Amino acid sequence: MLWAAGYLCLSQAQIAPPPDYDQKLSGVTVNATRSDTPLDQIPLNTTILTKEVLELAPDQTIDQILKNQPGVFLNDQPYYEKDPTGQSLNVRGLGNARTLVLADGSPLNDAFYGTIMWNLVPLSSIDTVEFIRGGISSLWGNWGMGGVINMNTRTPKNSQQEVSANYGTFNTVNLAVSKDIMASDNMQLRLSADYLNTGGYTNIATISPAAANSIKPGMGAAAAENSNVRLQSYFKAGTDTKGFVRVGYGTMADYSNAMSIATNLKQTTDIAAGTTTKLSEGDKVLVNLFYQKTAFNKQNGSNAAVSSVFNAQKLATNTPYISSNYYDPYSTTGAGVQYIKDMKGLVDQVLVGVDGRNISGSNLTNNLTTTGAVSSVNYAQGQQNFYGVMGQAKSTTSFIPLQTTLALRIDNWSSSTPIYYNTGPEGKNASYQNISNQNKTILSPNLGFLYELSKEWNLRSSIYQAYHAPGLNNTLRSYASSSGGNNFANPNLTVEIMKGFEAGTDYRWKEGFLQLTAFTNQVTNAITTYNLKANNATDVALAQQLCGAAKGSNPLKAAAGNCVSTSINYYTNNQNLQSQGLEMQFHHNVSPQWAVDAGYSLTNTILTASSTSDPTGSQVAGVPQNIGNLGVTWFPVPKASITTTMRYVGNSWMDTAHTLPVPAYAIFGLRANYEINQSITLYATAVNMLNRQYITFGSGSNNSSYVLGMPQAFTVGGKFTF
């Protein structure tokens, strides 16, 4: 597929790219920079994917298209086949929930879990995707370690209607409709809705090195159902102000961890608005705000064990039952103002801004026995606040073609957890924790250089500091299970800090481009889970407090208080990690009929310090060192295209101790497009075209945790505009 490339949208549908589109793309403004910076002036490794490029990809969800971007670690499993708590994004091996994802400048990161709400932005609604790698906390604050991905959605056009529909393997149905309304010269509306339903596939692996008996009774295909409705309004308020308002509601339902008796339901209301006011030539003010409210009802299923304390009904071993249910209501509200002034002289542009955000939520967990009785309850309620001030200046010297960008942001982060308790059976014997408020001021600088060797060739480098605050799932969500013991949230967690440097080059010629980037990142206070030790006095005291156990007891040697097991896990900041690597993106138009794309990433991510059992100096779990892509597109006629892709993922490990290997694999994809006329385009795709059976990368604790990669899947569909 054509990736790491894009081109300007034309006035009518077009399958083949226009001439010199790589050169034209270089001047496209990247909204994720917050400063109207053209692509060829960004000192960080940056990619733009346009709608036309997205439509050449065999994959049918935006997460699976992004997995082919160098530096992205998303396994070969569509988001809807994953539990909502596992729909994460890892960039440059830095770990999940450390990269910011936006839709039209508003966050798509789940406010509680930090995962990505891919379901709220179906592929049919996306116009372009901007991807800036590297530390960007200087502009965006939290989640700014791995970079930022901004999806620009489609805007109203000519009062048209559009229907996109496809059907594929596993009875997967995807339907999207939209209606554009040109209400007046100053008001345009877009009303859209989409629906996805799939029978899914059984993604629990039983091929080597997975355990052959990993699929237990009650486990099956990961069926899922998503739906969204959205109303977008774009308006002009006078000659100098334009703005937008977006209101949406989305649902996502699936089986929890492929257990057909356990269901998940996530319901999200999403509101965003913004204005841009031109004060004078080169001066403007931007105002934006957003609000999201989510209700997440989740069940977990387990298989009974005769010896388990949860098996009060004495069910036969492996009999499925609901082992817990959760209710997580949460919301986030944010707003910001920024001022941009273009200047002449020593400084070319100045940006200043201020913003704030609140995240509030709670978690109620009922841990259940096989009879449905409540064995214990975990509850916590809390909030986090972020307030930031930022500034950025750009300067280009006249005597040498060097552009310098200096950005600085100061954030104040606070966290409060007024209620945190764990109970015994039926909610009795509650053990309350008194939690001190957390408060930290964080400095996020970024200094970037871009040197123009020629019109086609530049060198770039950037040094930065970024941060990531603990998620509410780390500070509020506690639970127990028959297999994993007691897992407690830690409301005393603090922020992670990353220091990084990268250097690269971009070379663009008439028929293509080549981008090369080297990076190094150091993360301190990295959040991880820690298994409390029975011979550690500090751990024993903490276990007594969490379990509500009597002094003198040791819940880590014998179950005591409200704890159902001697296995007690707790989140901690006691890890440091290092991520270093290389990224390469290449595109070349061999002829008007042929185009070639290639990409490669080499990523070495290790722990440099750890208080857990994870060893230092070893490649961390879920991060393959080598990932490569190759794509070839043929345009037999201007209205048709055939794209074939190859994705290679090298050897990796499910655990950092390197006891659970994940073998390397390569898979192939295919897509054919044909534009019948300006109103009708048909397509057919194949994912895993050769039907390879393979285990995709991830993390886990035993050989029953392996995940099967996407099996062979065919899709046929069309887009109809009228």
Across the structure, where does each feature detected by a protein language model lie?
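N-terminal Sec signal peptide and the immediately downstream disordered periplasmic leader
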Residues: 1-59, 63-67, 181
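Gram-negative outer-membrane beta-barrel transporters
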Residues: 396-404, 412, 519-522, 531-534, ...
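Periplasmic-side early beta-strands and strand-to-turn transitions of outer-membrane beta-barrels
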Residues: 150, 158-159, 166, 172, ...
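Face-selective signature of the C-terminal outer-membrane beta-barrel domain
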Residues: 234-250, 267-427, 434, 450-452, ...
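Short acidic/polar hinge/loop motifs at secondary-structure boundaries
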Residues: 89-90, 106-133
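Extracytoplasmic beta-strand/coil segments of soluble accessory domains associated
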Residues: 63, 67-106
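Outer-membrane beta-barrel signature, preferentially recognizing the C-terminal barrel domain
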Residues: 263-278, 328-330, 378-384, 434-444, ...
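C-terminal beta-signal and adjacent terminal beta-strands/loops
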Residues: 467, 519-525, 529-531, 648-655, ...
